[in-house]
Design a protein with these regions (language model features):
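C-terminal amphipathic alpha-helix
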Residues: 40-44, 48, 57-60, 112-148
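Bacterial N-terminal signal peptides that target proteins for export
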Residues: 2-12
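A structural signal for long alpha-helical coiled-coils and helix-turn connectors
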Residues: 62-65, 69, 92, 99, ...
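Amphipathic, well-ordered alpha-helical segments in soluble domains
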Residues: 50-57, 80-83, 87, 106, ...
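Short, charged, amphipathic alpha-helical segments
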Residues: 74-79, 101-108, 127-137
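C-terminal segment of classical bacterial N-terminal signal peptides
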Residues: 16-25
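Short, solvent-exposed, charged loop/turn and helix-capping segments
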Residues: 84-104
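Immediate post-signal-peptide N-terminus of mature secreted/exported proteins
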Residues: 24-75
Length: 148
């Protein structure tokens, strides 16, 4: 009878553990929301405004590329646009999970386009600079198309 009682206690403990495990919030936390909350939208708008502030300066960069002012192109990329990757990452982290990977890829390619533009400026390569500036503009606009 003592063995039977021990067996029942162990079985009951396993059943209770299993039932409690099904109802934990960890399972619910793994499922991401399909829509934005108002707090998420506010945060996204704040971070996107910081990225947009840099975007408002893109015509300046374009004018420098067009004028083939390579020193100022490099300074501009390393100065005001030096924070771009971090700012894009902040926005990306606050997107819905389904959009984060695509945003991460676009942000990475945009940063690579800026780095290539900087290399082209150092090499005085007009064609590469024009191509990388155009690629960056496209990627920048594609990134903003993911935002709500």
């Amino acid at each position: 009878m003592k063995r039977f009682h021990s067996f029942i206690v162990i079985l009951l403990a396993l059943v209770i553990t299993f039932v409690i495990g099904l109802g934990t919030p960890a399972h619910a936390a793994r499922q991401s929301p399909a829509v934005y909350t108002s707090d998420q939208l506010d945060t996204l708008q704040k971070y996107a405004a910081n990225v947009q502030a840099l975007g408002d300066r893109l015509p300046e960069l374009g004018a420098l590329v067009e004028a083939e002012d390579w020193i100022h192109v490099s300074n501009f990329i390393r100065g005001p646009f030096g924070e771009l990757r971090a700012r894009l990452s902040r926005v990306t982290r606050n997107l819905l999970v389904k959009d984060q990977e695509q945003a991460r890829q676009i942000a990475k390619k945009a940063a690579e386009a800026l780095e290539s533009l900087d290399r082209a400026a150092q090499d005085n390569n007009v064609q590469a600079a024009d191509a990388n500036y155009a690629a960056f503009l496209t990627l920048y606009n594609n990134f903003f198309s993911l935002l709500p």
